[in-house]
């Protein structure tokens, strides 16, 4: 059920907010022992939120835009009075004394909090297997990963445990799991949505965005969470357009660029390539013009990212020293030993690996060769995008080179895991908005996602193209049943 449909049913009294909330909590009780999408379920809070909506409706009050909409929140967004762990032992008992800007805006808009979702530890991963509290499974095939790092949010939406969810995207952490789980995942322009209250991984790359079952709902959520925030100096102080009204704008004259370098990748699965190109042809049939474009440095994005992101992470995670908050190791006889032991015991192996990479890249004698060089390449990647947008409105690529892989398949091969974000990372480096939406299925019945990328602050155009494709292709109405969780 779409948010607009729910809103109508609520106003007509066909379903109450409490009834919908109880339905979602019952669904979670049935499927989450298998999926493990949630770390914490806030049932009492959810019922209280829903009751307030029903009481307001009974009193004749006008309802906010997300009244009674049951949501899940990735557990790296601070929620006041509710545990926020980042799926790490380091923050296992951390309860924030404040609310993140995005969640605050959701509650003001009437949304109902169902709980906090699992993720790769500190959002570092592409499979949700590095969580200190256990992996999440893919609803389409529980032997496979849901993607990452926002795998819990993607799986929860795909399995019908919530109507929508929030995630964060540093190098593809919304779009890649959206592709793997067959849902819509939107990464807004860097600075379009406040990061205040998002536990930082890589501050120049992180962005908050929604997971939904359809494009219109993504527009609804973005409408609520977008906008300037004086508490976040990187948040853009620009007007927020009406994203929902943009959906129905005609497609005639829209130019869509197919990035040559994306379709020439050696690791691109043949079924993924064929399905995404078919999606491009569908857009052409709707009135769009297809143009082949080149972004010569697109493939350099992954090497660039794995210098910049770990460097920023090594600085951001230095605050976890066992002194003020977070995990503190016992038995150390000196401050330095306590800090070292706290980090060794509190951080998982992938987080430690990235901290070490970042520390090395920033060290004396290597900073020029690695970090500064990576920033120069980042600028060149952005310039490639600038050149492409001189001739097209939207760029089209596969979201991921493959469909969801088996759990444990890349456990001993970090490089193979990193390559899962090969096609999503460049949009983060350039700060561009991008969306993944389902475009078909492989021979195993697993979802395939198509990625659309627009220029800075062109979310309206992005959502317009995605919406027209979704309405015409109607992909999810024809999905195979396969091993999808009951």
From Swiss-Prot:
Coiled coil: none
InterPro entries documented for this protein: Amidase, Amidase_CS, Amidase_dom, AS_sf, GatA
Enzyme class: ligase
Catalytic machinery residues: 74 (charge relay system), 149 (charge relay system), 173 (acyl-ester intermediate)
SUPFAM superfamilies hit by this protein: Amidase signature (AS) enzymes
Entry EC number(s): 6.3.5.7
GO BP annotation list: translation
GO molecular function: ATP binding; glutaminyl-tRNA synthase (glutamine-hydrolyzing) activity
Xref: PROSITE patterns: AMIDASES
Domain of life assignment: Bacteria
Gene3D superfamilies: Amidase signature (AS) domain
Subunit record text: Heterotrimer of A, B and C subunits.
NCBIfam families: gatA
Task of the protein: Allows the formation of correctly charged Gln-tRNA(Gln) through the transamidation of misacylated Glu-tRNA(Gln) in organisms which lack glutaminyl-tRNA synthetase. The reaction takes place in the presence of glutamine and ATP through an activated gamma-phospho-Glu-tRNA(Gln).
Protein name, as recorded: Glutamyl-tRNA(Gln) amidotransferase subunit A
Chain's gene name: gatA
């Amino acid at each position: 059920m779409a948010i607009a449909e729910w809103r109508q049913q609520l106003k007509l009294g066909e379903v109450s907010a409490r009834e919908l909330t109880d339905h979602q909590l019952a669904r979670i009780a049935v499927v989450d022992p298998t999926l493990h999408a949630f770390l914490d379920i806030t049932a009492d809070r959810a019922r209280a939120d829903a009751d307030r909506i029903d009481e307001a409706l009974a009193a004749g009050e006008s309802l906010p835009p997300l009244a009674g909409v049951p949501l899940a929140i990735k557990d790296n967004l601070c929620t006041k009075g509710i545990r926020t762990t980042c799926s790490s032992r380091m923050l296992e008992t951390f309860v924030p004394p404040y609310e993140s800007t995005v969640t605050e805006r959701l509650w003001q808009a009437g949304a109902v909090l169902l709980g906090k979702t699992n993720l790769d530890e500190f959002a570092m991963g592409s499979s949700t297997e590095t969580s200190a509290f256990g992996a999440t499974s893919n609803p389409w095939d529980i032997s496979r990963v849901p993607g990452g790092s926002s795998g819990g949010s993607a799986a929860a939406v795909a399995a019908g445990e919530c109507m929508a969810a929030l995630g964060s995207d540093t190098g593809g952490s919304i779009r890649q799991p959206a592709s793997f789980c067959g849902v819509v995942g939107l990464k807004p322009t860097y600075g379009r949505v406040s990061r205040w209250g998002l536990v930082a991984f890589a501050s120049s790359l992180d962005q908050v965005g929604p997971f939904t079952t359809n494009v219109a709902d993504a527009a609804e959520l973005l409408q609520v969470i977008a906008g300037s925030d004086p508490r976040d100096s990187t948040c853009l102080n620009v007007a927020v357009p009406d994203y929902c009204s943009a959906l129905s704008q005609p497609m005639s004259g829209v130019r869509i660029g197919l990035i040559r370098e994306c379709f020439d990748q050696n690791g691109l699965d043949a079924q993924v390539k064929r399905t995404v190109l078919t999606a491009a042809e569908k857009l052409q049939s709707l009135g769009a013009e297809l143009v082949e474009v080149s972004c010569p440095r697109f493939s350099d994005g992954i090497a660039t990212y794995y210098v910049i992101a770990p460097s920023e992470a090594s600085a951001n995670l230095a605050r976890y020293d066992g002194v003020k908050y977070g995990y503190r190791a016992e038995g150390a006889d000196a401050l330095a030993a306590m800090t070292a032991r706290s980090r060794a015991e509190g951080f998982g192996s992938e987080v430690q690996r990235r901290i070490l990479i970042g520390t090395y890249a920033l060290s004396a004698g290597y900073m020029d060769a690695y970090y500064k060089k990576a920033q120069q390449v980042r600028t060149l990647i952005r310039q490639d995008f600038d050149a492409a947008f001189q001739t097209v409105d939207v760029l089209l690529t596969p979201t991921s080179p493959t469909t969801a892989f088996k759990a444990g398949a890349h456990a001993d091969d970090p490089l193979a895991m990193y390559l899962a974000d090969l096609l999503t990372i460049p949009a983060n480096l350039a700060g561009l908005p991008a969306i993944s939406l389902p475009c078909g299925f492989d021979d195993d019945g697993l979802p395939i996602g198509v990625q659309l990328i627009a220029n800075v602050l062109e979310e309206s155009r992005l959502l317009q193209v995605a919406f027209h494709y979704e309405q015409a292709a109607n992909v999810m109405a024809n999905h195979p049943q396969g091993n999808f969780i009951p």
